[in-house]
Amino acid sequence: MHKVTSEELFQRALKVAPGGVHSPVRSFKGLDRAPVFFKKAEGAYLTSVEDKKYIDFCQSFGPLILGHLDAEVKEEVHRMVDTAWTFGATEIYSLELAEWITSTLPFMEKLRFVSSGTEAVMSALRVARAATGRTKILKFEGCYHGHVDNLLVKAGSGLAGTAASSSAGIPAEVAAHTVVAPLDDEAKLAEVFAAQGKDIAAVIIEPLPANYGLLVQRPEFLKKVAELCEKNGSLLIFDEVISGFRVGLGGMVEKTGIRPDLVTYGKIIGGGFPVGCYGGKAELMNMVAPSGDVYQAGTLSANPIGMRAGLTTLKKMQRVDGWNVLEQRTKKFTDAIKAGFVKKGVNLEISQVASLFWIHGPTASPIRSIDHIPANQGGNFKNLFLKALDKGVYLAPNAYEVGFVSLAHSDELLEQAAQIIVDAAE
C-alpha cells in the first residue's frame, strides 16, 4: 500500500492554497525542498506523514510553552468541548481569564479578548487614534505587528520621513500614516519626534523584537522611547504577542519597568488556540464599544476553549515556576551549542533570552537592529536547517525566525538536540 509523502501532499496543496500553505513561512521557501507535512504532535515532538519524529523548536511559533498536547490543558479542553464550543454571548470562561490577568498584572487594568495578535494590534491602534485625535503611528524597522495594513511598511530613503508598503494591495495613503524609525538609535528617534511628534498618536514596539531575529534592545533605548512618548503626548504600545508570558509572568513590562499605555498579547495567552488580547489603562479601554465609541467586535472573540486552555497554561506555568525552569534549561542548551560551534570552528553564534533562541552569523557587537544582521544569514541557516532536519530536529524554517523551548523539552532531549545542531553546522 502506497504511503503518501510530504512532496505529494505539497503538490496537492499548491493546487488549492497560495504557495500551498496558509501562512507564508510554512512553505520552506528558499530551502529548495517541499515542506514537511505533519500528522501528529505530542510533547516536544512532531511526527510527519512519513512517520518520522522531529524534536520541535518551532512549537507553532511560540504558543505552546508547555509543549504539544500538555495533559492538563488537554483535559481542560476536552471538558470544555463537552460543555460548549462557542456562545456568542456573555459567559464565565472569559471572565475568569480576564480576572486572573488583571489581578496578576497591575498594568492590565482592563482588557478585551480577540482571536489573534493581529486583531489585538489593529484594535489598540484604533484606541490610540481615538484617544489622541491624531492619525500617525510610529513603528520600528525590524518589528512585526501582524498583517495590519498600515504596519506592513518599511522605512523609505532617509530618516523615516516616508514609508513604503511591504505588501501589494496596501494603498500609499494608508502607508502614509505610518512613520518608521530604526531600532537602537535614540538620536534619530528624537529627530523623528521633533519633526512629526505632534502628529504621532502612538508608538508601537516589540520591547523584545523577535520576528526578525532576536534583537535585544538596550534599556536606555526603551526608556527613551517611553520618555519621548510622554513628552509628545503619544501613547506607548508594547506588542508582547511573542514576549508576553514567554520571558516571564509579567513579560517585558516587568523586565523593563516601563509601563506602557496599552499592551497586546497572543500566542501563549490562548494555550495553543486562536486567542489575542489588548488592554492597559482603564480610561483608554473604556473608550471601546459598548462603553465608548471605538468599535471592535468579533464572532469568536473569547471562545471558551481558548479561554480555558490559556488559563490552564498560565496557572500551570506559575505553579511549577515554569519561567525559571525554562530559562535555566534553555541557557544550558544554548551554552552547549555555543561551545560546540567554537570547538568545531564554525562561524555561527547563538543568542538566547529566556526560552527564546536564535542562530546567526558572527558579529562584533550585539545584534540590536536589522542593520547588524550578518549579510550571509540566509545561506548559513539553509545548510544548518536542512542537515538538522535530516537528523530529526525541526527549527523554524526561516533564517530570521527564533526558536522556542517548551517545558516538554527535557534536559536530556535538549542535550541530544544540541549535538545534532552542532553536527549540522559547517
From Swiss-Prot:
- Which branch of life, at top level? Bacteria
Identification of the protein by name: Glutamate-1-semialdehyde 2,1-aminomutase
Q: What is its main location?
A: cytoplasm
UniProt source species = Bdellovibrio bacteriovorus (strain ATCC 15356 / DSM 50701 / NCIMB 9529 / HD100)
Query: What would you give as a GO molecular function for this chain, any one?
Result: glutamate-1-semialdehyde 2,1-aminomutase activity
Q: Where is the protein situated, by its record's location annotation?
A: Cytoplasm
| GO cellular component term, pick one | cytoplasm
Q: Please list the cofactors this protein needs.
A: pyridoxal 5'-phosphate
- Reactions that this protein is recorded to catalyse: (S)-4-amino-5-oxopentanoate = 5-aminolevulinate
**Assembly description:** Homodimer.
What does the record give as its pathway?
Answer: Porphyrin-containing compound metabolism; protoporphyrin-IX biosynthesis; 5-aminolevulinate from L-glutamyl-tRNA(Glu): step 2/2
* In-chain residues carrying the UniProt-annotated modification N6-(pyridoxal phosphate)lysine: K267
Which gene is the coding source of this polypeptide chain?
A: hemL
EC assignment: the record states 5.4.3.8
- Which UniProt key words apply to this protein? Cytoplasm, Isomerase, Porphyrin biosynthesis, Pyridoxal phosphate
